[in-house]
Every structure is written in structure tokens, then in C-alpha cells.
Amino acid sequence: MEFQHFQPAKILTPYIRHYYLFESSESVGYEDTVFPSGDMEIIFNLGNGIWESYQRGHYEKNPAIELWGQVTRPLQIRSVGVHLMLGVRFFPHATSFLLDDEIGIFNDQVSDLSDIMGRNIRDLHIQLAENSSITARIALLDTFFTDRLARAPKKVQRLHKVARILSSITQGSSENSIGRIADTHGITTRHLHKLVYQHTGLSPKSFDKIHRFKTSLKLISENKLPLTSIAYDAGYFDQSHFIRDFKSFTGLTPSAYLNNLSTVNQMLIN
């Protein structure tokens, strides 16, 4: 397996965390579990491999153009074949500039983006498949998303406000400080909840919870600190709080995860 990151055009950096290319050269079966990250993704399947995700009580074949909603619980995936996948990973709030639907309806699902965005995204997929150069593919993505951004000035203005709110939430906030954060940004607590949910598909509390988990996952994967220190550095009240949250997102205790690191989550952790 080969996994590479690429940065988007500068104008897109407040919205797109990175592009990535995933390639596998062997036609072998593969299974893993995806954990919550707080981010949403678009994935263009450019190879012949088949991916399936466990949704609605059974495995379903993923579409050619995947929209990954917020993952709020462990999501099982499996694949077979030779893969070439080009992904777009957005910051937690940023997919909303592309979509007219409420973001929360996509939670814990892999949706067919061509059904949502229509011909424009299908044409982009065709162009990406026709170009074998990664430089050309990145240029196509940059052009497409820059154009979509230019069409949504009002959405972009709200995105900047939501980005500032999310930054406040992740900077050492607790459940009890949401009211103070709302005051800081000159809005009511109710409006803060509405803005965060509309743009991320998550409540402020859930967003903060996933952020802490993601921090702990990265620290565990680095394997440089004891679990007690990781719990503290990630912002948990105590060790039991850390273990409870970690298990709800992975199905494993932190120590069990450390002994069985997930390939997909290792690749996507940054």
C-alpha cells in the first residue's frame, strides 16, 4: 500500500486539510475499521478495486464518488482488488460550502456524491480518471473547488465564523464553557449549537469529544508517552473518562488498540 498527501491551492487551505492518493498494487482482500476523525471526505475511486462499508446492518458497495459523512462510531470497511483512490479531506466545518443539504443527514454513511452534486462532479471524476499525472489531477481538484468556493460568498463568510468558534471549542474548553464561548463570539448558546451542527453535523459537545479522541489517538500511535500522560495531554478529566470515550469510538481499550494499530487510521491520523 502507498499513501501520499498533497496540499491544495493556497486559497483552499482554510477549507481543505489535504488531498491524498491511496494505491495498492496487489489484488488481495482487506478489512479494517474507520474511527471518528471530525472531518468529512470525498473519495474518487479511479481503480478497479471494490470497497464496501458496513451500513444499515450489512455491507454495501461504495459508489465511484464517495461522500464520507461524519463518522461518530466505529465503521467497518472491507475491500478486494487493485485500488487507486484520490481523496479530499475537509476541515470539520468546510464541506458545507459544497452542499445544500443539512450536513448531519450524512453522518455514519458513505453516500453517492454524484446523486447529490450531479453532472459537475461526474465530469470531474471522468477528467481525473483520464489524467494519469498526479500534478494534473491536483490542478483539476484545485480548479473545481476554487470555482465552487467563488460561487458561495455568503457560505464562505459563515464558514469563517464557524471556524473561529470551533477553534475556541478545541482550545481547552469544557462542556460548561460553551456559554462563555458564545458570549465571546457575540451570539447566544442556542445559535452557537445551531451553527456548529449545521456546518459539522455534530453538536459542540460531540465535536469536542471527537477532537479529544483524535488527539489521544495520535499520541497513542506515536507510542512515546504512558497512557496516563496521554489522557491528561488530550484533555480528559481522568483515566476512566479517557478509556470510556476511547472505547466508544473504537470498540477497544487504549491498551488493546496499541497492540493492534489500525492501518487505515494510521494513514489518516494527520
How would you label these PLM feature ranges?
Residues 222, 226-229, 243:
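Phosphate-/nucleic-acid-contacting segments
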Residues 186, 207-210, 240:
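Conserved structured core elements
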Residues 156-160, 168-169, 196-220, 245, ...:
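Alpha-helical DNA-contacting segments of helix-turn-helix folds
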Residues 1-163, 169-173, 177-179, 185-189, ...:
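Alpha-helical bundle regulatory/interaction domains
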